[in-house]
Amino acid sequence: MADKADKMKARLPRGFVDRVPDDLRAAEKMMATIREVYDLYGFEPVETPLVEYTDALGKFLPDQDRPNEGVFSFQDDDEQWLSLRYDLTAPLARYVAENFETLPKPYRSYRNGWVFRNEKPGPGRFRQFMQFDADTVGAPNVSADAEMCMMMADALERLGIQRGDYAIRVNNRKVLDGVLDAIGLEGEGNAAKRLNVLRAIDKLDKFGPEGVRLLLGKGRLDESGDFTKGAQLPEAAIEKVLAFTAAGGADGAQTIANLQAVVAGNAKGEEGVQELADMQALFFAGGYEGRVKIDPSVVRGLEYYTGPVFEAELLFDVTNEDGQKVVFGSVGGGGRYDGLVSRFRGEPVPATGFSIGVSRLMTALKNLGKLDVSDTVGPVVVLVMDKDTQNLGRYQKMVSDLRKAGIRAEMYVGGSGMKAQMKYADRRAAPCVVIQGSQEREAGEVQIKDLVEGKRLSAEIEDNVTWRESRPAQITVREDGLVDAVREILDAQARDRAEQSK
């Protein structure tokens, strides 16, 4: 026996999670529904590897000798740096560039998979998580961006989220660029200050207009006494930015009119507003008014995107860790990224896409009761009473017959006795067990114990009359009638579940 001190400690790395069967089934059920919508729109699946050359990812390269800030990186045997992908978009850009001549343009694809971030983990922040993306590469017109928004709205509704409980919010990088240019922040030399402005606007939901005003100016002192330095804009520039964030109107037409007034005279800003107007016309024509909204307060990701940017937000309340009611918030986002594929091609390649945070959307659906996998039926367990080779073969035949009939089934392969086997079947959520001892075998029979009915009877039946009138929890049938008898039990249980769910 190994010394206790030599035992390896079983421990999960920080920032990672194990996924149990219910979570896996729930995720697959949700993603299958999303795939149905994306397929309906004519998008095709594609899969890229988890590992890419680090320079193909492009975003995180602070140190060429050790480029693992933000990503998990390693060197291969020819000393080239490789990294685990941090999103699904950069690998898609590489794939499209590498196969550009053979792919149809526009190229419409979707993919789901794990992504990795080499960042400090915390509550709700993991180093490995799943995304589900859809992208169109090679479409310069904003009709492709509008389609992304409409497809996301349809996916949320197909998942059971009602109208009024979600909104796809849309903005345009060019509009904000027009505002920033108008206040003197044009050009790469002002990149840091532009980013500070974006970060300030992103706090609008959290701090309100006055909080954003402070962050655009000298800075903001919070309740704990911490001071956040502001963007140091002059008062006139602050008013211009706040006018942009407050441009949202009663409907899309009013919002667009307000934005036109804010960027009047700036060509880039006016181009962005026109793109929003074109998208709004498509939303109206498709019947998506109220579901997809033009919203100037959307700034998340604007430093990355080159045109329209969109965010899927769930509007219902949930209780946070402090017991407070809060709006659930974002479950995905995207936008136009015309520069990403162009890095490989040396020529303009327009692209737009949308990414769903799978775990976050799963949490939302569970809160709404829209992702119930409790109807998953465990396997029928054939108990093993005699372990000699000949009788094991008989048990194996029973299992095979059940499986051929499309019934989940397993033969107990442990080494324990009858009591432990019954406990095992209960922990496996088995709907019933099959028992054949020597007496049943000689008679050519099997016993089938309905575990679901047995639990119900033991909890509910108080007198012998009721017991006799109930469906019996254990029956004996001919061996050749096993499959039919098990199917009858499973069908009865399914009817009971359906009745209880009404």
Curated annotation (Swiss-Prot):
Principal EC category: ligase
Predominant location category: cytoplasm
Entry's localization field: Cytoplasm
InterPro entries found in the cross-reference section: aa-tRNA-synth_II, aa-tRNA-synth_II/BPL/LPL, Anticodon-bd, Anticodon-bd_dom_sf, His-tRNA-ligase, HisRS-like_core, HisRS/HisZ, HisRS_anticodon
Domain of life from the UniProt record: Bacteria
GO molecular function terms noted in the UniProt entry: ATP binding; histidine-tRNA ligase activity
Family annotation (CDD domains): HisRS-like_core (cd00773), HisRS_anticodon (cd00859)
Cellular component annotations (GO), alphabetically ordered: cytoplasm
One Gene Ontology term from the biological process aspect of the record: histidyl-tRNA aminoacylation
Catalysed reactions listed for this entry: tRNA(His) + L-histidine + ATP = L-histidyl-tRNA(His) + AMP + diphosphate + H(+)
Keywords: Aminoacyl-tRNA synthetase, ATP-binding, Cytoplasm, Ligase, Nucleotide-binding, Protein biosynthesis
EC number: 6.1.1.21
SUPFAM superfamilies in the record: Class II aaRS ABD-related, Class II aaRS and biotin synthetases
Record's subunit section: Homodimer.
NCBIfam families found in the cross-reference section: hisS (TIGR00442)
Similarity field: Belongs to the class-II aminoacyl-tRNA synthetase family.
HAMAP family: His_tRNA_synth
Protein name per Swiss-Prot or TrEMBL: Histidine--tRNA ligase
Organism: Brucella ovis (strain ATCC 25840 / 63/290 / NCTC 10512)
